[in-house]
Structure formats: structure tokens, C-alpha cells
Amino acid sequence: MYTRYSYNPTLGRTYVYDNKYYKNLGHVIKNAKRKKNAAEHELEERNLDPLDKYLVAEDPFLGPGKNQKLTLFKEIRNVKPDTMKLIVNWSGKEFLRETWTRFMEDSFPIVNDQEIMDVFLVVNMRPTKPNRCSVLAQHALRCDSDYVPHEVIRIVKPSYVGSNNEYRISLGKRYNGCPVMNLHSEYTNSFEDFINRVIWENFYKPLVYIGTDSAEEEEILLEVSLVFKIKEFAPDAPLYTGPAY
């Protein structure tokens, strides 16, 4: 007969589990997913291995080629708070005529072994009272030929211009370089056809607005320029043939 003070071998019996045979279920699932993701990532990298022999520039503006800068205008614009002002509108053909004439006649000689790889619209904005506000910018590339943009718009999701106060837009259409061969004859024969078949076939029409985050009216010094990225091919024969080669 057992009493409460009697020894009972079943009382106080404990079971000890060896942890090496038991694992957390969440850990098992996470580890399986981790192995699966690692295998997929390794397969993806293996498919991209042939691309290792190619070099690309992180910033196309700093990539290979010659940058030819053409300053369009410099002026001061007053910008009111909570608004953005139109500073670039390429709907006028006279503006385009002057720009391309200067580019082709004054900038550098056009030869047959050059090609326009890209065109950048660069807007340098410097407030006359620095360290008081940040500059905002907004742009659009595609618009109908009969679209008339507003001179002033409200600020809607603009981009903050960096500390260098430079806003840069690529105007070249992707995968569509603009060869410079016979451009002089195209331009001289018919300017209207040149605009439609050469310029708008290869480049976008930009609309650019600027503003500030200031609560007061600000004066901004603008410098708007085009930077042509020129691809130069190697000549057929070396420029110098002699014992040094």
C-alpha cells in the first residue's frame, strides 16, 4: 500500500530529447528556401557569364565618345513659390534652325566617320541667393506636335536637383543612333524634311519646368546647353607610320 510518502518509481520521471534529432520547423523551411534561391541565383549568374567580356558605363554621359557642348542660352528667371516655370520648349522651328546651324557650322567639322550616339539636354541652375532653397525640376519627352504647354504649372512630384545644380536629360531614342553622314546636304536641301526625318526620328522633344521649395520668390541663373555624345571611329590607316610602330 502506497502512501503519499512512499517511493513511486513513476513519479518525477522526465524524458530527455536529443536536440540533434529535432529541428525547428521554421528553420527547416527557411533553409530549404535559401538553398533553392542560391541554386537559382547561381544558374542566373551562369547564364550572364558571357556578358563579362563587355564593358558599359554606369552613367552614359561619362561613357566612351567625345562630348561636344553647345550652349543655348543663359538668363535669369524669377520663380514664384509652389509653381514651376517652363524654360525649354522645342516647338519653335526658328529655335531649332539656329541651334542646328551653330552645331554643324561652328562646333566642329562634320566628317563621314562620326556618329551622334546620344544628345543630352543639360540645365545648370544656380539660385542667386544660395543655401536658402533647393531647386526642383520636371520634364516631359513625348508630346504631340500641336500640344501647347502651359507657361506655369503647379508643383506635382518634382525631382530635386543635386548639389551640383545640374539637371541632365537624355534626348536620344533608345537603340537608334543618328549617323552624321551627309547631314549638311540634308539640312541644306530642305529644313522641314530635316526636322521631321532626321531630328524627330532620332530625338525626343523636351519640355522642362523648374521651381524651388522656397516660400518666397527666387531668382535662378539658368544655363541651358546641349551635349552631343559623338562616336569617333578609328581611321583606316594610322596617322603616323614609322619605326615607332
Swiss-Prot record:
Q: Which UniProt keywords are listed?
A: Viral occlusion body
Ranges in a coiled coil: none
InterPro entries on file: Polyhedrin (IPR001746)
Could you state one GO cellular component term attached to this entry?
Answer: viral occlusion body
Keyword Coiled coil assigned: no
**Which is an annotated GO molecular function term of this record?**
structural molecule activity
Any Pfam family matching the protein: Polyhedrin
Q: What does this protein do?
A: Major component of the virus occlusion bodies, which are large proteinaceous structures (polyhedra), that protect the virus from the outside environment for extended periods until they are ingested by insect larvae.
The entry sums up its family as follows:
Belongs to the polyhedrin family.
UniProt name for this protein? Polyhedrin
Q: Which organism is it from?
A: Malacosoma neustria nuclear polyhedrosis virus (MnNPV)
